[in-house]
Amino acid sequence: MNRIQILSESASVGMRLRDILYQDGFSDITLADLTALQDIPQNAVTIIYAKSNISALMQNLSDCGGSIILLLNPDCYAMQLDRARHMGITLLLMPVAPYMLLDAVRNAIS
């Protein structure tokens, strides 16, 4: 099973995302804040939750590899949809339903 890295601007959201994945059987999960953005491994599925400075985040993600799932609040989602699609990033709307998160992770792994 692939490694999963969660980078979150909110510790409580990051822990909730990790719990959803653990409950579904995923085990190789690391949790960090957004400062770990420079260390995204090529072979990991990276889940990122951000609520501020989205433009700079998208600029940084353009150089990253691997599978990226980006979770955004409604006020940012629509503005970044086309850009994320062009960059090959899966974009999900917060609050994300557990089944949607799990489907996105499974699709990124396969």
Language-model region placement:
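Conserved acidic carboxylate
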Residues: L7-S8
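Two-component/phosphorelay signaling modules centered on CheY-like receiver
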Residues: A11-A32
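Acidic, metal-coordinating helix/loop segments flanking the phosphotransfer/catalytic sites
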Residues: L31-V45, S52
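Short beta-strand elements of ligand-binding domains
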Residues: I48-A50, S67-P74
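Short amphipathic alpha-helix used as the core "switch/output" element in two-component signaling
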Residues: S55-C64
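Alpha4 helix (beta4-alpha4-beta5 surface) of REC/receiver domains from two-component response regulators
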Residues: P74-L91
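C-terminal output helix
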Residues: V96-V105
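The C-terminal output helix
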Residues: R106-S110
